[in-house]
Amino acid sequence: MPPMTPTQVLPDAVRDLGRVHHIALIVRSIEASLGLWRDALHLDLETVMDIPDDRVRIAFLGVGESKIELVEPTDDSTGVARFLEKAGEGFHHVCFEVANLAETLLRLEIDGIELIDSSPRRGAEGPVAFIHPRSCHGVLVELIEAPGGPAWASLGF
């Protein structure tokens, strides 16, 4: 029998991604964007909030079991603002829910996946971490821990 790879040694729950939590779009103005997403497409506006540490303003709109996140930069010197200037409005990242974020990050690191965040950090809706686009065919991937997971208490949620 061939030796097990590091991924095979870990529990199934660590290997499996959950649902798509949200798709994030970069916009110049959340208010202007709500004319489409909330008013024309009738998505439910769940929240609008400032994230001072990231220098962005965000809005979440519910769609089925997932969400659309609108991200508006509040400072022209941020990576989000530079992305908006270079690429224009549109797709920014996809976010998947995982049961245990720290274990998932460890598994990804063992598998040689380039991470932006090697440990969970506070996000707007729970513990999050990002995978570098170089490891994901040019797509920025966010992971968010499912409610009640181990990182929630350690990050003060």
Q: What do the predicted segments below correspond to?
A:
Residues S33, D44, I68, D76-G79, ...:
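Short loop/beta submotifs within extracellular cysteine-rich repeat domains
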Residues I51-K67:
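C-terminal "cap" of GNAT-fold acetyltransferases
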Residues T5-V56:
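Long, hydrophobic N-terminal alpha-helical segment
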Residues V20-V27, W37, L61, I68-V71, ...:
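Short, structured motif recognition centered on aromatic/hydrophobic residues
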Residues P11-V14, A81-K86:
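Short, flexible, solvent-exposed loop/turn segments with mixed acidic/basic and small polar residues
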Residues P2-V14, V27-G35, A59-F60, E69, T74-D75, K86-F157:
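Vicinal oxygen chelate
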